[in-house]
């Protein structure tokens, strides 16, 4: 076709467009962006150029992004603190940023791990048998709730009333 050029990503004007597409879908870490661009088949030099362009435009900022993701996890009320930490670290955020974001967001939201775990236990109704309790315990532990808390809710203190 005359008048149409196929984008190869090599033109200066096209640099950053792939990164912007990834970032438009959701908040991602710099490491997550690099991985997504690599999976798209871009060579290392192009990945670096895309990341630099995104940084220069101000749309790639791990400190801002990890805080947004931490806030969503806290508001989702489905994970314990360790589960939220694991999720953020697996997304490629640096440990120091994850710790700071979780600390700040948890304090701001006055989030309490016990109350979140109690909500989840109430929603599922604690099974009367040991096998059912063990299944519920595995679910809570897999979501990053503290083992002492799970033990207290399911065996020691009994199910929360509500």
Describe the function of each predicted region.
Residues 1-162:
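An alpha-helical, amphipathic repeat domain used for nucleic-acid recognition
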């Amino acid at each position: 076709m005359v008048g149409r050029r196929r984008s190869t990503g090599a033109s200066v004007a096209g640099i950053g467009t792939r990164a912007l597409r990834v970032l438009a879908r959701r908040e991602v870490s710099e490491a997550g962006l690099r991985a997504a661009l690599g999976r798209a088949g871009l060579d290392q030099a192009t990945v670096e150029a895309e990341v630099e362009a995104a940084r220069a435009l101000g749309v790639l900022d791990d400190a801002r992004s990890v805080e947004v993701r931490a806030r969503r996890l806290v508001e989702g009320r489905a994970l314990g603190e360790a589960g939220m930490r694991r999720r953020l670290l697996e997304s490629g955020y640096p440990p120091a940023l994850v710790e700071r974001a979780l600390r700040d967001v948890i304090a701001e939201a006055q989030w309490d791990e016990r109350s979140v775990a109690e909500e989840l236990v109430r929603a599922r109704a604690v099974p009367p048998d040991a096998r059912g309790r063990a299944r519920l315990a595995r679910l809570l532990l897999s979501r990053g709730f503290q083992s002492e808390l799970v033990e207290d809710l399911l065996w020691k203190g009994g199910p929360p009333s509500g």
